[in-house]
């Protein structure tokens, strides 16, 4: 009996230890941000970019906006769920004058297939947290792009964009930046030439278009 209890206890310790040792999704990305901030104090009154890979892969974003000070803390593959989970880590170290968000596309395309209302709910939660941290900062949301590889999700993306647009338009010191039409051909179809082979991430030409649309909104 004693041996059984001993073995059971050791098994419990092993399982518990294994579970607690597992890292949360994107843990390493957050630690990387902390390392960057420790090496160099983040500037005050900058523009804080948060979100998923469309921002993450914009590594030379400062070259597109040379007269702006931008802190890019986006991490590829992230969902609004992850922004909410890591909100303290993403917001506490900074004192921005503006927060620009691109996120939600991965929520919609996730295997759990959340509804437009659920994705919108996640955004509102993050917006509320950002506003609580930065009462006077401008908050801007860049609309979800209609990536060719995710055409099956376009209807939900359009619903989410509409909901967030109406929400942001009703808020003070908030912006909805719609990049969707600027990425279309004259006939209204998506310009696939703006995308890499994966038809998900953009080429530099896509970012040039984003720059033209976004610039008037940046503080």
Predicted regions mapped to residue ranges:
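Sec-exported extracytoplasmic/periplasmic mature domains
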Residues: 88, 92, 104, 128-135, ...
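Alpha/beta-hydrolase-fold catalytic nucleophile elbow
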Residues: 102, 142-143
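Conserved beta-strand termini and adjacent loop/short-helix elements that scaffold enzyme active sites
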Residues: 73, 142, 177-179
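Bacterial Sec-dependent N-terminal signal peptides
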Residues: 1-24
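Charged, glycine-enriched surface loops/patches
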Residues: 118-142, 159, 163-174
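Catalytic His-Asp segment of secreted/periplasmic serine-dependent ester chemistry enzymes
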Residues: 14, 146-219
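Conserved SGNH/GDSL esterase-like catalytic core that processes O-acyl groups on lipids
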Residues: 23-122, 148, 153-158
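Short secondary-structure boundary/capping segments
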Residues: 39-40, 61-63, 131, 166-168, ...
